[in-house]
């Protein structure tokens, strides 16, 4: 009798462990093609999901730390994993909004591997955030609009006499000021030093005067593609992933100006007090493997933050899911990184508010 009870209790414990070992949890990201690439790249490929042991509910948000902070401070945490920008990774960890990850224990040489990304960035910006992708602000144009000499450098974007026509520019100053300095002759590797030094922002705004009267502003990621397609502008700043998807999946006729692209990144973190913290951390280990980062690139042209992911793509080209080569559309190849500006999220977090008035005045003068 007691033996049967013992066996029954062990069975109940085993079932309970099985039920909780891979609990369902929530993954929060930005939506659209990017979230789809995450779904196919490392959500659907995670062992517990493939085996039917867990389900991952995907939700979208508009970024920032507001909702994360509200959940943590209320003690009612509903989100588990969140895709975040660098400044939110840094600030969120400092404010105790994300779980420390102890990434050094994930796999042998992990920290060294994520630092080996070719950007000069140390790889780890926070003990609470794991590496995801590099994306970039880049210039695109329709080559049919320039039957003769084509624009190839950032200074061409600012030269409305040599390359006449409207330019698409987003409604916030990040990346625009960096691009202006590149167009003004600053080497991409020196842009942050100049921008952050005495008179740096004034120099950038002075260069922006070259575009006066030739700007169409956009605020949503799909808009600049439509502006170029329709001929409303001849060139535009865009997110490279949007442009890559339009070219590779839709056959759009765009070309890039890679010089002076402004490189940024996305990271993934576990919310402090997440209801399924252990499962979430195990998921992050899978999502940030070399193989998972390469798999995501089959569906979007953002670059793996780990170089080993990029190496897998190089060996497997043509890599995009429809059989087209993806590397010509990625921002973090060795050649392109030499001509890139790596954004400084901490500086922007500290100075964005003070630049807002000057930026708003510049935008108003370009209507």
Describe the residue ranges of each PLM region.
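Extracytoplasmic ligand-binding site segments that recognize negatively charged/polar headgroups
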Residues: 32-39, 84-229
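A bilobed periplasmic-binding-protein/Venus flytrap-type ligand-binding module shared by bacterial periplasmic
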Residues: 138-145, 181-183, 265-279, 295-298
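Paired acidic/hydrophobic, glycine-rich loop segments that form the ligand-binding mouth/hinge
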Residues: 76-83, 217-218, 234-239, 255
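Periplasmic-binding protein-like
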Residues: 201-211, 248-274
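A ligand-binding cleft/hinge motif common to bilobed small-molecule-binding domains
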Residues: 88-91, 235-253
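Mature extracytoplasmic/periplasmic domains
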Residues: 271-338
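Conserved C-terminal helix/tail region of periplasmic/extracytoplasmic solute-binding proteins
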Residues: 333-367
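Early extracytoplasmic/lumenal segment of secretory-pathway proteins
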Residues: 23-91
């Amino acid at each position: 009798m007691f033996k049967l009870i013992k066996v029954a209790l062990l069975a109940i414990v085993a079932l309970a462990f099985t039920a909780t070992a891979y609990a369902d949890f929530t993954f929060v990201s930005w939506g659209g093609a990017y979230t789809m690439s995450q779904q196919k790249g490392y959500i659907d490929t995670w062992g517990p999901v493939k085996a039917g042991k867990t389900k991952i509910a995907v939700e979208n948000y508009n970024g920032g730390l507001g909702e994360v902070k509200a959940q943590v401070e209320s003690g009612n945490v509903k989100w588990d994993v969140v895709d975040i920008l660098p400044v939110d990774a840094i600030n969120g960890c400092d404010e105790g909004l994300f779980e420390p990850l102890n990434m050094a224990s994930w796999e042998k040489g992990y920290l060294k591997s994520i630092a080996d990304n070719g950007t000069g960035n140390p790889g780890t910006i926070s003990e609470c955030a794991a590496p995801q992708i590099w994306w970039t602000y880049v210039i695109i144009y329709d080559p049919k609009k320039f039957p003769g000499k084509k624009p190839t450098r950032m200074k061409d974007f600012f030269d409305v006499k040599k390359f006449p026509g409207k330019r698409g520019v987003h409604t916030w100053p990040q990346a625009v000021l960096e691009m202006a300095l590149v167009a003004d002759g600053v080497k991409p590797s020196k842009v942050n030093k100049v921008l952050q030094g005495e008179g740096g922002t004034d120099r950038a705004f002075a260069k922006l005067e070259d575009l006066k009267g030739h700007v169409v502003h956009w605020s949503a990621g799909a808009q600049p593609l439509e502006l170029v397609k329709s001929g409303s502008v001849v060139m535009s700043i865009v997110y490279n992933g949007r442009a890559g998807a339009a070219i590779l999946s839709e056959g759009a006729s765009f070309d890039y100006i890679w010089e002076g692209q402004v490189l940024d990144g996305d990271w993934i973190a576990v919310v402090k007090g997440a209801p399924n913290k252990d499962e979430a951390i195990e998921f992050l280990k899978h999502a940030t493997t070399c193989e998972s980062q390469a798999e995501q690139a089959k569906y979007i042209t953002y670059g793996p933050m780990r170089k080993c992911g990029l190496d897998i793509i190089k060996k497997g080209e043509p890599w995009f899911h429809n059989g087209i080569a993806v590397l010509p559309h990625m921002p973090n190849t060795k050649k392109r990184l030499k001509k890139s500006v790596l954004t400084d999220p901490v500086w922007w977090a500290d100075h964005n508010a003070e630049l807002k008035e000057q930026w708003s005045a510049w935008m108003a003068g370009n209507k």
